A protein has these predicted regions:
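Cofactor-/ligand-binding subdomain signature composed of acidic, glycine-rich
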Residues: 2-52
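Short alpha-helical segments and helix-capping/turn motifs at coil-helix boundaries
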Residues: 10-11, 47-48, 59-77, 137-138, ...
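Cofactor-binding active-site loop characterized by glycine-rich and histidine/acidic residues
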Residues: 34-190, 419, 458-459, 463-466, ...
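Short glycine-rich or small-residue beta-strand-to-loop segments that form or flank ligand, phosphate
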Residues: 45-52, 77-81, 139-140, 166-170, ...
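Non-catalytic terminal/interface segments that mediate subunit docking, oligomerization
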Residues: 53-57, 66, 79, 98-103, ...
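N-terminal leader/propeptide and maturation segments of large enzyme subunits in energy/redox metabolism
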Residues: 109, 315-380, 726-739, 743-754
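Thiamine diphosphate
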Residues: 118-139, 148, 160-166, 175, ...
Length: 775
């Protein structure tokens, strides 16, 4: 039964709500005269009003009621704003409860001067953005690119059993693919060890200019939809603020009681509850000018106020006065004390909840010594699976960090050879398990029981943003699904670094395998190394790209990135059986340098090379070394310098990237005047772009050139002309003294012909490839 709410409580709620709305309108429009102490003048209005109103009043309404229940029930709660825009609403609430002034002491007086500053800064040059940016205390989801709020919320509550994440989902946002999938994430939550997500669907009826689907279908259909998703929907509908306050307050009281019941029962029963959610149906632009309330026209700036539309000044003034500011502010512009006392204690506010600023962070414990994981290597003779060996290292990371480390991926942990991980944990799963299922458990550290890359990435981001650790792994081609999502996280990191009070977060570590050179069995659709290109233009103090080429370089690289903060680290690695090249000691030294000569492979004997052979990635390295072995036999007089790149950004100039080599270092390594043939894992333009300003312009790159099909592993390399024979044919072109003797060229052409005939006859690579060993 719903608890009755008194008239006094309704009045308190309404005063707070009116204040939040007044501030939100002021932030949108006003430059001066924040208290309306005189009639509004056009000079009081921002010359360029930028922002959105449509979602703000509903978010203010929700926040108003969260303040009440946080205080009443002493809740540990965060607020996640999913709807696009409406950033001024969250700023307004932070301002009212004092969390804004706590982070920005220049607002501590809370008077008319502070109010003027608050209004001016919103969507104003040198001020703050129109979304819930990292500058906003309590934010972990900006809400610019839509669809990620709910997965962020579910990531935030993992291993955070006392937390309630109230996630407001716009009804337009609910139509995005990532958000539509995220409703299913409640199946992965264990109510005993995880917190609770309280989704609130803001059903205001419109997007920018179109109606929303969920607002136009029958309510019983909407309710049935969410029941089918595993939720217990509560409908809060209306447009009369006081009636709505009563309904919302009573509903939230009932929900808190229900959440407490779920938490209590979870200690003694293994079950998946129906989690509460609210369907909040209010008019878009609620409480705004009557001409636009409930229409899509309230989405952005509901009324235009400028010199050409000066008559609208009166409408704006009437709108602001409808909130009765004289009842909300003292004469000096400070907020009335009874409204301030309505708020929870400062340390309990959503704006200052430690979860939103890395405050629950426990430092990641990593193995002290990599020798335990070292693969004993006989150079070029030993064969092993890099990803499988890395799994043994990650297994121990999980054992050392039982409640603050997760592994995310779309049902690929076994496919990507992380088998050893399951010696220490299971997949996280909290719904029906049947006899033939494997590796499922309520408290697993592996989040890969949902197939959406968006959902996996979103949960990991939510986990990292609340101070924990982990990584996502994916097939290389299909990480492209989250291109823009990772871009948004890069923007978040960039901005957060510039905010003094934002704490460092663990890096977003992305491990790509099943890459383009190992997708001969799946074909063209599974071959796309373009995620490297996607990350390359991002801020140099944020992006790191690594291409380890054997087990020991992979383990060394992964150990390194796991220790970093505030980066996006990309690692591309092999999962198939491959030749092994470096001991762990050699790997650690090589990875620390990031790029270096493989002196054991070079044939210069300390003399000036005829050609530089460079490589980055496991497959290009294999083919370069195979080419060298052929040349050592057939042209022993040829002086070849072999360079391997693990840290791709070493190729960038040091004045553009902190990892970059100086020109002097680069020239010493690559020479200033000898031809460079670079075999690269991805698209060739990446290397050309990174080395564009270097002295030596005699750069020739082989890489993936969009040639692929279902074929053999070696044929994939042949199709893209990155194989040993094509590399030697290139070397002949670039080293004039090799052009006189046609035998080497004829040998390569004949081997390519033999290869083609062999695969089309037998369906597998010839022995010269499969049995090749370094010597």
């Amino acid at each position: 039964m719903k608890k009755k709410i008194t008239k006094e409580e309704i009045n308190e709620l309404d005063r707070y709500f009116r204040l939040a709305n007044y501030l939100s309108v002021g932030e949108l429009y006003l430059l001066y005269n924040p208290l309306l102490t005189r009639p509004l003048d056009i000079k009081d209005i921002k010359p360029n009003v930028v922002g959105h109103w449509g979602t703000a009043p509903a978010q203010n309404f929700i926040y108003t009621h969260l303040q009440r229940i946080i205080k009443k029930y002493d809740l540990n709660m965060i607020y996640i704003s999913g709807p696009g825009h409406g950033g001024q609403a969250v700023v307004a609430n932070d301002y009212i409860d004092g969390s804004y002034a706590h982070m920005y002491p220049e607002f501590k007086e809370g008077d008319e001067t502070s109010l003027k500053k608050l209004f001016k800064q919103f969507s104003f040059p040198g001020g703050v953005g129109s979304h819930v940016t990292p500058e906003v205390p309590g934010s972990i989801n900006e809400g610019g690119e839509l669809g990620y709020s709910l997965s962020h919320a579910y990531g935030a509550v993992l291993d955070n059993p006392n937390l309630i994440a109230c996630c407001v989902v716009g009804d337009g946002e609910a139509e995005t693919g990532p958000l539509a999938c995220s409703w299913q994430l409640n199946k992965l939550i264990n109510p005993e060890t995880d917190g609770i997500v309280l989704p609130i669907l803001n059903l205001n009826g419109y997007k920018i200019a179109n109606p929303t689907i969920l607002s136009r279908i029958p309510k019983d259909e909407v309710i049935a939809y969410f029941q089918g998703m595993g939720y217990k929907p509560y409908l809060v509908k209306g447009d009369d603020p006081k009636k709505m306050h009563k309904l919302m307050a009573e509903t939230l009281d009932e929900i808190i009681s229900y959440i407490n019941k779920i938490k209590k029962e979870s200690k003694t029963h293994t079950f998946r509850p129906f989690y509460p959610m609210i369907i909040l149906e209010t008019p878009k632009g609620w409480t705004g000018p009557k001409e636009v309330v409930g229409t899509f026209k309230s989405h952005q700036v509901p009324i235009i106020v400028n010199k050409e539309n000066i008559s609208n000044l009166k409408i704006l003034e009437s709108w602001l006065k409808s909130y009765k500011p004289e009842e909300l502010f003292n004469t000096d512009g400070t907020i009335k004390e009874d409204i301030k006392s309505f708020c929870p204690p400062l340390e309990k506010t959503c704006g200052l909840n430690p979860s939103t600023n890395g405050g629950i962070k426990k430092e990641l414990i990593l193995p002290e010594n990599l020798d335990k994981y070292a693969l004993k290597v006989k150079r070029g003779q030993t064969q092993s699976e890099d990803m499988r060996n890395l799994g043994a290292y990650i297994k121990d990371v999980i054992s050392l960090n039982k409640d603050n480390y997760i592994i995310c991926g779309p049902d690929e942990a076994l496919s990507n050879r992380l088998n050893h991980v399951f010696e220490a944990t299971t997949r996280k799963w909290n719904t029906k398990i049947i006899k033939q299922d494997e590796l499922l458990g309520r408290n697993g550290r592996v989040i890969d029981s949902i197939l959406s890359e968006h959902a996996c990435e979103g949960m990991l981001e939510g986990y990292l943003l609340t101070g924990r650790h982990g990584f996502i792994h994916s097939y290389e081609a299909f990480v492209r699904i989250i291109d823009s999502m990772v871009s948004q996280h890069a923007k978040w990191i960039k901005m957060a670094k510039e905010i003094p009070w934002r704490k460092e977060l663990s890096s977003l570590n992305i491990l790509l395998t099943s890459h383009c050179w190992q997708q001969d069995h799946n074909g063209f659709t599974h071959q796309d190394p373009g995620f490297i290109n996607h990350l390359l233009p991002k801020k140099s103090d944020t992006i790191r790209i690594y291409l380890p080429f054997d087990t020991n370089t992979l383990i060394s690289t992964f150990d390194h990135i796991s220790r970093t903060k505030n980066y996006i680290n990309l690692v591309v690695a092999s999962k198939h059986m491959r030749p092994q090249w470096l001991t762990m000691e050699e790997a650690i030294k090589h990875c620390a340098k990031g790029v270096d000569e493989l002196s054991w492979a070079s044939t210069t004997n300390g003399k000036t090379p005829d050609i530089v052979l460079a490589c980055a990635g496991d497959t290009p390295t294999l083919e370069v070394l195979a080419a060298v072995s052929i040349l050592k036999e057939k042209k022993p007089e040829l002086k070849i310098k072999v360079i391997n790149v693990v840290d791709l950004m070493k190729l960038e100039s040091n004045d553009k990237h902190p990892h970059g080599l100086t020109d002097k270092e680069y020239d010493k390594l690559f020479t200033t005047n000898k031809p460079i043939l670079f075999a690269f894992h991805g698209y060739p333009n990446v290397i050309h772009e990174l080395t564009y300003n270097r002295t030596n312009k005699d750069m020739h790159v082989r890489g993936y050139i969009e040639e692929g099909t279902i074929t053999t592993p070696f044929d994939m390399r042949v199709l893209n002309k990155i194989d040993r024979y094509h590399l030697i044919l290139d070397i002949i072109k670039y080293v004039p003294k090799l052009q006189k003797d046609k035998s080497l060229q004829e040998y390569c052409v004949s081997m390519l012909e033999k290869h083609k005939k062999h695969i089309t006859t037998y369906g597998c690579d010839m022995k010269e490839i499969t049995s090749w060993k370094w010597n």
